[in-house]
Amino acid sequence: MRILGLDPGLARVGYGVLEVDEQRRNQPEMVDCGIISTDAGRGEGERMVEIARDLRQLLRLHRPDLAAVEKFFFYRSSNTIAVVQARGVLIMTLARFQIPTVEYPPMQIKLALAGSGHADKGEVQDAVMRELRLNERPKPDDAADALAVGLTAWFQR
């Protein structure tokens, strides 16, 4: 099974691709991680188009069986609204590719990985490193967060 974890953002969307041999019930392995970045000099609409285009390329390259996306329940600022709009672009693009999608709020991701819904970013990143048997924390932070979302999907299956 191949899982794509996504950490939504307007400037940067983190992504992490995990592979798991379900027959053997193996630990997930990281296939790829990184970011989709958009040009801050462009308008929001153009940036959303960039996100959709780059996500389509990732989907064609990695062919995930499942996608997991971080979900937000509250809006504190106009910047948060842009992130939620970018999240909508991700969800729409995944639907167009008919990829089953699950969503998790930040507290559930923290609880699944670090054992506490109030864990800090470092604790979650250390858990990602441990679960994937990595020698160092994945960089940038957005990619590490996306791997955490993907791992949550595996743990919650």
Curated annotation (Swiss-Prot):
Its EC number is 3.1.21.10. Its cofactor is Mg(2+). Mg(2+) 2 binds at residue 70. It is an enzyme of class 3 (hydrolase). It is found in: Cytoplasm. Mg(2+) 1 binds at residues 7, 142. One of its GO terms (molecular function) is magnesium ion binding. The active site is at 7, 70, 142. Keywords: Cytoplasm, DNA damage, DNA recombination, DNA repair, DNA-binding, Endonuclease, Hydrolase, Magnesium, Metal-binding, Nuclease. GO terms for cellular component: cytoplasm; Holliday junction resolvase complex. It catalyses: Endonucleolytic cleavage at a junction such as a reciprocal single-stranded crossover between two homologous DNA duplexes (Holliday junction). SUPFAM superfamilies: Ribonuclease H-like. The RuvA-RuvB-RuvC complex processes Holliday junction (HJ) DNA during genetic recombination and DNA repair. Endonuclease that resolves HJ intermediates. Cleaves cruciform DNA by making single-stranded nicks across the HJ at symmetrical positions within the homologous arms, yielding a 5'-phosphate and a 3'-hydroxyl group; requires a central core of homology in the junction. The consensus cleavage sequence is 5'-(A/T)TT(C/G)-3'. Cleavage occurs on the 3'-side of the TT dinucleotide at the point of strand exchange. Belongs to the RuvC family. This is Crossover junction endodeoxyribonuclease RuvC. It comes from Synechococcus sp. (strain RCC307).
